[in-house]
Amino acid sequence: MRTKEEVYELVKENLIDLTTVSEVATQRKYIHDEIKSYLVENYFGFATSPSVNIELMNVLDEVGWLDKGTFTLEGRVVVPIRNADGSIATLVGWRKGFPKYYTIADKDFSKESHWFNLDRALDKSFNGDSRYRGSVVVVEGIFDALHLDAYGVPAIATMGSDVNAYKGAVLNLFDKVICVPDNDKVGQKALLEKKWQVPTNSTFLYVEEKRYQFGEGLSFQVKDIDNFLSLFGSQIHEVLVPLVQNRGAVVERLVL
């Protein structure tokens, strides 16, 4: 039986339509070259179906990625959720509309214990840009983390609204934690009601909501870190680096 990693490689080779990456960027309002290149490099285009490839259908079925004869994440952007050692726990798929995300159920995966992108964050935190050494940025959404990752920022996603004690303990691997919850009621609870059980010296950064007007009938709303990156790109370093250097516990608001 093939490993999940081997089957994922087959998915990338046979099912991911890289010609759709530009459409993914358009739907997510990504305009900067860094994130566009990142999407291509990581095969973040929309998935097709293996309907004429019996061998591929069989291996997909072996790992639980086949549903009624078709790839479970057909029509979605396929993103692997990995363990801290880099091995694949399961796959999650994104598309515009409802439901936006669909995670393939797997005995090796639980939102209660897994951080999204932890493997890359550990590598970037201790082997990447020295400005971020020993630090990590905690966000809610998968694409928040991926967008930061594209700019070399060690970032992990909760994949939900809470950070329980187990996941909070994992954060002790880092010297400095910067929490960036979404700007909504759930995100506000992360600080006000302490829904995120994070180290005591963690910094909370809130992105102030603002709508930008670009000429007649064209506007862009910034309400989370993904939106901020879509508009301002590499300027994110000007925001995060000073917070990394401050080892105390603070609350900051990113006023645009």
Predicted regions span which residues?
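Short, exposed beta-strand "edge-strand" segments with a Pro/Gly-rich flavor and a Y/T-containing core
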Residues: 23-30, 103-126, 212-231
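TOPRIM metal-binding catalytic domain and adjacent DNA-binding surface shared by DnaG-type primases
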Residues: 1-78, 82-85, 127-131, 243-256
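Phosphate-handling DNA/RNA-contact segment within nucleic-acid enzymes
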Residues: 50-175, 190-191
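Short charge-dense sequence patches
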Residues: 2-9, 141-144, 197
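TOPRIM fold recognition
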Residues: 25, 89, 100, 132-136, ...
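Aromatic side chains
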Residues: 8-11, 30, 101-102, 174, ...
